[in-house]
Amino acid sequence: MALRVVVGADDAGYEYKEALKGDLAADDRVTEVIDVGVGADEDTAYPHVAVAAARLIAEGKADRALLVCGTGLGVAISANKVPGIRAVTAHDSFSVERSVLSNNAQVLCFGQRVVGLELARRLAREWLGYEFDPTSKSAEKVQAICGYEPATS
């Protein structure tokens, strides 16, 4: 499974984004890392970063995204505004696993003020190893979720 992964953060998640970006670039499962910001001296509000990342997935230009803000909540809420995107905030192994295997979530969000860096790095490594099975019992539930999205023209 070769993945194109988008990374993004606001200023409250910049340090973790940079560390995770380095880990992703060194991981053989990742073929491309796309950084949508912020830069070291930038101050872009998290909704803009999260939506930019989610749109790349929705447009087929990336497979997954890893987003960081202070809590991980704002980036998840923002990314979920993009049709077809399922973003979660998860700070434990079981939730990370189930986010992919049960919910086919493409976006994993962390809170830099909530979870330690080493745990975030470990969870990101684990997350890369999970792949949704479209023939699983969960597939019908994911389709039901998608059915609640407004039709796009």
Curated annotation (Swiss-Prot):
Function: Catalyzes the isomerization of D-erythrulose-4P to D-erythrose-4P. Involved in the degradation pathways of erythritol and D-threitol, that allow M.smegmatis to grow on these compounds as the sole carbon source.
Catalytic function, reaction form: D-erythrulose 4-phosphate = D-erythrose 4-phosphate
Factors inducing expression: Up-regulated during growth on erythritol, D-threitol or L-threitol relative to growth on glycerol.
Primary enzyme class: isomerase
InterPro entries: Rib-5-P_Isoase_Actino, RpiB_LacA_LacB, RpiB_LacA_LacB_sf, SPI_LacAB/RpiB
Phylogenetic classification of the source organism: Bacteria, Bacillati, Actinomycetota, Actinomycetes, Mycobacteriales
Species for this entry: Mycolicibacterium smegmatis (strain ATCC 700084 / mc(2)155)
Protein name according to UniProt: D-erythrulose-4-phosphate isomerase 1
Domain of life: Bacteria
Statement: the UniProt record of this protein carries the keyword Transmembrane: no
Phenotype of gene-disrupted mutants: Cells lacking both derI1 and derI2 are totally unable to grow on D-threitol or on erythritol.
Pathway(s) served: Carbohydrate metabolism; erythritol degradation; Carbohydrate metabolism; D-threitol degradation
Listed Gene3D superfamilies: Sugar-phosphate isomerase, RpiB/LacA/LacB
SUPFAM superfamilies: Ribose/Galactose isomerase RpiB/AlsB
Gene: derI1
PANTHER family tied to this protein: RIBOSE 5-PHOSPHATE ISOMERASE, RIBOSE 5-PHOSPHATE ISOMERASE-RELATED
Listed GO biological process terms: carbohydrate catabolic process; carbohydrate utilization; cellular response to carbohydrate stimulus
